[in-house]
């Protein structure tokens, strides 16, 4: 057995680990390095065609953003992840590809003027659209047999819709070992995400440690402050703009606003950035079925594309 670290080692993005066991090569996550020049992402430190399986803990781009590069460069294996992560990846990776294409187009306009060679995008929308062909979805808590001597279990990590920690049970040379990859672990008592679950034992644990030295405030401790700011601003005839991550944070923010009663009678307008699948925005429904310890108060009533919707439709 051999474990190699190709990302999120001495840094916080680009999660990518490779486990070699029983003649098979298994990736756990394949994320983009973010906040650096793209040269860090252009070359993969392994031959994609040599990878048999890729297990994705969740859809955030720093954990899944180089999956289209795998496929573009010869990956022929299978991608295993949860159903909701698969759904989110199909949207987010196409948006990422749209950004890659736009960035390359912008740079190439400058390259042409300067007489420099043109650059290719890391991957294209067409590359990202192929990803679902390679995905097999897994259910939380249900063992999945990958190959001889390798079994996996995904459990809810409470970080994002579909996020998971993964335990691999590995048998080789008459010995059986378990190794857990935590993925990003969420906080407890979040408004629209279930609390994280935890494995009770493992021989080895590969732990994400971003924010690991920080004590988070309780989610509802700041909603009263937010409600006060919103009400005071609206009372003066103003508008409140709240920059937010598009995935989860925005939904959680709207949930907190609704639960606090802020801006009663006023309807929030959510502005989406440009998307590779522009025509599909507003028609995508992603939901986790089953009982929730919290979040049951949420109701999705109407989603509409386009400019500010009439109040009667919200």
Regions from the PLM with identified roles:
Residues 229-314:
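Hard-cation-handling environments
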Residues 78, 165, 178, 186-253:
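Cap/insert and terminal regions of metallo-dependent hydrolase folds
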